[in-house]
């Protein structure tokens, strides 16, 4: 089979297993599989990894629990021996160095041994796994905005769900919040059903599905009479049906997922808000999604609604004198700092489908010098435009508009792992149209295929964290059952 035929197999694979099999074949043909089998590389400390691997294995097999525990405390961090170096995952298609994969598997076996060993008391295990949780930190999955292209996130979530790699912290902005919230208010079993049947649901968020789309003249008239092009009531109706009547606190209690939604304020001096069960426990999730999807000029700014946990009375959520909110992507598409502050997040998986952003995202660690030069040029151009917008804002020329535009340009739109599904730019005209079932199926497929290329790095970066968190939860439950 030729290289081009294998690439086509990868491009049109129907499952991750099929894609991985083709990726390994391509690595063999290109000589990259041999690179994976060779432990040597300047990109990480392979000597330290190999020696630590042998030490961990020796202590686990000989059941030297105390010595093993001491070693693990210094071995579970993602950046141990520089193993999180993105260059290690940019060369071969099917994964990184086999030594790194072997090390991760050994750490997982050691953690399982610690959870099950009779050498430690239950309280000791809880204490040690709590410390290990702090050492590894937390991963957050962030789903960007992108209009109907945001439905590509369905496939991203499907792939991560199938591999058992969905983080407990999920954040969404604008269209990404629709998928994030629909998933995070449900438990794992319900999530699986939702993701499988998402394309059959009602997502008529822009216009009445039973009426003809408004003409250009009607849209212009609507804008000048109401200040927006589309009626927000359709978005509200669909979100209530899709998400239900849960508050952020209720969603967390129900599913265990820490759901976050970013919203922007329309004024000049208000900071963007990150809504979750800590900052806005009683806010209704559907209203947060409506607010973050309220694209300026397209929809009117929205009101956040909260429900009193005692009286069940619903009222406007107002933490400022300006209770109207809009598209979270304007100020904070990827809220790195706030998530780090609130939830000890030190690792970000970003699914980026903003069609106006994706062409400009380039890997700074790329081996391709042309890509590196292009990225430098784009960064310099963005800085110049940003300074111009800032100057206009400081001179009082449309201050709010130019401040928001500057925010859009200067934001960071990528993460430690950035998933960029292939977008169909021929369908840009559908970005603010009600998505059809066929469009949703195609978007989900693109999302899945875009995620498969990142499964090896995601698994190696997150497997230890996920096992530690699961073991800690089991130990806590066991402790409570004994009381």
UniProtKB/Swiss-Prot annotation:
Keyword Oxidoreductase part of the UniProt annotation: no
Annotated catalytic residues: 174, 327
UniProt GO cellular component terms: cytoplasm; lipid droplet
Principal location: cytoplasm
Gene Ontology molecular function terms on file: triacylglycerol lipase activity
Keywords, sorted A to Z: Cytoplasm, Hydrolase, Lipid degradation, Lipid droplet, Lipid metabolism
Transmembrane segments: none
Residue ranges occupied by any PNPLA domain in the UniProt entry: 141-340
Protein name (Swiss-Prot/TrEMBL): Triacylglycerol lipase ptl3
Species of the source: Schizosaccharomyces pombe (strain 972 / ATCC 24843)
Gene name, Swiss-Prot/TrEMBL: ptl3
């Amino acid at each position: 089979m030729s290289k081009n035929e294998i690439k086509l197999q990868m491009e049109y694979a129907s499952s991750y297993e099929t894609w991985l099999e083709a990726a390994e074949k391509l690595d063999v043909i290109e000589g990259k599989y041999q690179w994976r089998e060779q432990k040597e590389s300047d990109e990480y400390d392979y000597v330290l990894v190999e020696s630590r691997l042998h030490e961990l294995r020796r202590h686990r097999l000989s059941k030297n629990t105390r010595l093993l525990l001491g070693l693990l405390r210094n071995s579970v961090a993602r950046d141990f021996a520089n193993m999180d170096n993105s260059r290690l995952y940019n060369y071969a298609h099917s994964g990184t160095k086999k030594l790194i994969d072997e090390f991760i598997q050994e750490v997982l076996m050691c953690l399982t041994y610690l959870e099950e060993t009779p050498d430690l008391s239950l309280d000791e295990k809880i204490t040690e796994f709590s410390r290990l949780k702090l050492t590894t930190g937390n991963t957050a999955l962030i789903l960007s905005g992108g209009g109907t292209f945001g439905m590509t996130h369905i496939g991203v979530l499907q792939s991560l769900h199938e591999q058992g790699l969905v983080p407990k912290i999920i954040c969404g902005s604008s269209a990404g919040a629709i998928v994030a919230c629909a998933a995070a208010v449900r438990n794992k079993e319900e999530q699986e059903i939702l993701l499988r049947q998402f394309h059959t649901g009602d997502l008529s968020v822009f216009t009445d599905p039973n009426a003809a789309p408004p003409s250009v003249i009607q849209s212009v008239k609507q804008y000048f009479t109401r200040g927006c092009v589309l009626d927000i009531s359709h978005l509200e109706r669909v979100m209530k049906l899709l998400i239900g009547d849960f508050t952020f606190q209720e969603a967390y209690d129900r599913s265990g997922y820490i759901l976050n939604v970013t919203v922007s304020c329309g004024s000049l001096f208000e900071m963007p808000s990150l809504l979750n069960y800590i900052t806005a426990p009683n806010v209704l999730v559907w209203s947060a999604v409506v607010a973050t999807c309220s694209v300026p000029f397209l929809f009117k700014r929205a009101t956040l609604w909260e429900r009193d946990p005692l009286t069940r009375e619903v009222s406007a959520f107002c933490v400022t004198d300006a209770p109207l909110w809009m598209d979270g992507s304007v100020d904070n598409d990827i809220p790195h700092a706030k998530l780090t502050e609130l939830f000890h997040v030190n690792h970000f998986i970003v699914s980026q489908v903003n069609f106006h952003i994706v062409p400009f995202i380039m890997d700074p660690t790329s081996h391709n010098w042309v890509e590196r030069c292009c990225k430098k040029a784009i960064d310099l151009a963005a800085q110049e435009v940003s300074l111009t917008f800032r100057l206009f804002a400081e001179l009082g020329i449309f201050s709010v508009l130019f401040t928001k535009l500057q925010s859009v340009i200067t934001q960071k739109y990528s993460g430690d792992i950035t998933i960029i599904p292939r977008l169909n730019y021929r369908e840009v005209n559908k970005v603010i149209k009600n998505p059809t079932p066929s469009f949703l199926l195609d978007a989900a497929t693109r999302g899945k295929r875009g995620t498969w290329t990142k499964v090896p790095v995601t698994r190696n970066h997150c497997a230890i964290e996920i096992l530690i968190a699961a073991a800690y939860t089991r130990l806590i439950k066991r402790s409570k059952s004994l009381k």
